[in-house]
C-alpha cells in the first residue's frame, strides 16, 4: 500500500511539472495554483475573491467593479503563484533553511511589510509573535528549532503524506517568520 502511495505521489509531481512546463490550462497544475493560493490567502484575511484570484493567475491582471482592493493582497497573490511554482520545481531537492527563507522573500517581496523597518523579509523573525493568543518560538530559538525539524524531515528517504503533514504542523508551531508562515 505504501509503495502504491509513493508511486501516486511521483505521478502527481510529474503531472504538475509537465503541465507547468507546457502552460496547459484547466489541468491539475492550473487548479492547484488557484485553489491553494486562494485558500491560503483567504485564511490570512485576503479580500480577493476566488474569481479575482483565478483571473490574476490566468491573465496577470485584475478587474474591480465596485469598491477597492488591498494592493498587498494582489501582490501576495501574484507572489504566491511564483512560490508554488518554485516548490514544484524543487520538490525532489533537500529542504533547507535557505530555500524556506527564499520562499518567504518571494511571498513578501514588494509588500508594505517589506518596507517596515521591524519586519524581516526572507529571514527569520527578530521580534516575538503569537498566533491566536498562543506564543510561538522565541526569535533566538528559531534557527535551532528549524535545524532540528529539517534534520528530522530530511533524514527520511521516502516522505509519506503523514510525514509532510507532521512537518507542516511542527513548522507552523515554530512560526519562524513575522508573517506568511502558513503560505510558505
Predicted segments with their positions:
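FIC/Doc superfamily catalytic core
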Residues: 1-184
Amino acid at each position: 500500500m505504501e509503495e502504491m502511495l509513493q508511486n501516486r505521489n511521483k505521478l502527481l509531481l510529474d503531472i504538475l511539472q509537465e503541465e507547468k512546463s507546457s502552460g496547459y490550462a484547466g489541468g491539475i497544475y492550473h487548479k492547484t495554483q488557484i485553489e491553494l493560493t486562494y485558500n491560503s490567502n483567504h485564511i490570512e484575511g485576503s479580500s480577493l475573491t476566488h474569481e479575482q484570484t483565478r483571473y490574476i493567475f490566468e491573465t496577470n491582471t485584475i478587474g474591480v467593479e465596485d469598491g477597492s482592493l488591498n494592493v498587498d493582497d494582489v501582490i501576495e497573490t501574484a507572489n504566491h503563484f511564483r512560490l508554488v511554482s518554485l516548490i514544484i520545481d524543487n520538490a525532489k531537492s533537500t529542504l533547507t533553511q535557505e530555500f524556506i527563507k527564499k520562499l518567504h522573500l518571494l511571498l513578501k517581496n514588494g509588500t508594505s511589510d517589506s518596507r517596515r523597518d521591524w519586519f524581516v523579509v526572507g529571514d527569520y523573525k527578530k521580534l516575538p509573535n503569537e498566533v491566536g493568543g498562543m506564543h510561538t518560538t522565541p526569535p533566538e530559538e528559531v534557527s535551532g528549532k528549524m535545524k532540528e525539524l529539517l534534520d528530522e524531515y530530511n533524514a527520511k528517504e521516502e516522505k509519506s503524506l503523514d510525514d509532510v503533514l507532521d512537518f507542516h504542523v511542527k513548522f507552523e508551531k515554530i512560526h519562524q517568520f513575522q508573517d506568511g508562515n502558513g503560505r510558505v
